[in-house]
UniProtKB/Swiss-Prot annotation:
Pfam families: MTS. One of its GO terms (cellular component) is cytoplasm. Specifically methylates the adenine in position 37 of tRNA(1)(Val) (anticodon cmo5UAC). This is tRNA1(Val) (adenine(37)-N6)-methyltransferase. CDD domains: AdoMet_MTases (cd02440). It comes from Escherichia coli O157:H7 (strain EC4115 / EHEC). The lineage of its organism: Bacteria, Pseudomonadati, Pseudomonadota, Gammaproteobacteria, Enterobacterales. It is an enzyme of class 2 (transferase). PROSITE patterns: N6_MTASE. It is found in: Cytoplasm. GO terms for molecular function: nucleic acid binding; tRNA (adenine-N6)-methyltransferase activity. Keywords: Cytoplasm, Methyltransferase, S-adenosyl-L-methionine, Transferase, tRNA processing. Belongs to the methyltransferase superfamily. tRNA (adenine-N(6)-)-methyltransferase family.
Length: 245
């Protein structure tokens, strides 16, 4: 490995089929995003949208999981993060399939005629709190730039009738998000509560909504077993991505 490559790989996350540099992004690649990217239903999708793309992690994961005919649009408001996402995509096997847009999602969706079978987002979820060190991190953590009602509205404007809109959120915020989504006409179709181990309460929730009514399937995912190694279920979900699984 060359010295420059070694330096690059300390600034990001190496997966089996791609590398995500994230040193210029406010929010880094982590378990939440990896869970969402591996969990979101991709069967039969033709076009995907990643709202708040950050480093491009979710778009890259979806590209790995879908056929070569699937097109993925990734929209990111912060210019430095969008540039890094573009660089990550350019170094991946899926340059021709992923389009990164530096844009405000509220403005971007009004210009689109295409509809998406799958929309995915790892959204900001804090309404207020301690001031962050940078405006970029504040934007990534707090809902001031993209509140949940606006996010749901934007997704509704560009999703297909049978499409899925998927998010990952802290458990309690996910419950509030679900109530809001239902009040806006969305239908909850998939829910996975995520706990660190069997002894702990769920701390994250994966949610999939659709404009179309249907049965809701719910389950629970435990990340680590009694031996503190990754559980069989978590391994099965993510082993296509983690380098050493």
């Amino acid at each position: 490995m060359s010295q420059s490559t070694s330096v690059l790989r300390r600034n990001g996350f190496t997966f089996k089929q791609f590398f995500v540099a994230h040193d210029r992004c406010a929010m880094k690649a982590g378990t939440d995003g990896i869970l969402l990217g591996a969990w979101a239903p991709v069967a039969g999708v033709k076009r995907c949208l990643d709202i708040g793309a950050g480093s491009g992690l979710l778009a890259l994961m979806l590209a790995q999981r879908t056929s070569d005919s699937v097109i993925i649009d990734a929209v990111e408001l912060e210019s430095e993060a969008a540039t890094q996402a573009q660089e990550n995509v350019a170094q991946s096997p899926w340059l021709e399939r992923i389009n990164v847009h530096t844009a405000d999602i509220q403005q971007w969706v009004t210009q689109q005629t295409a509809r998406f079978d799958l929309i995915i987002s790892n959204p900001p979820y804090y309404e207020q709190g301690v001031e962050c060190a940078t405006p970029q991190r504040e934007q990534a953590r707090y809902t001031t730039s993209l509140d949940h009602q606006t996010l749901l509205t934007c997704a509704a404007e560009c999703i297909t009738e049978e499409g899925f809109f998927c998010v990952v959120l802290p458990e309690q915020i996910g419950n509030s998000f679900t109530e809001l989504a239902l009040s806006m006409g969305w239908h909850l179709r998939l829910r996975t509560d995520v706990a660190e181990n069997e002894a702990r309460l769920p701390h994250r929730v994966l949610l999939a909504f659709s404009p179309q009514a249907g049965e809701c399937f719910s389950d629970r995912l435990v990340i680590r077993g009694p031996d503190q190694n990754y559980s069989e279920a978590y391994t099965a979900l993510t082993q296509a991505f983690y380098l050493f699984m």
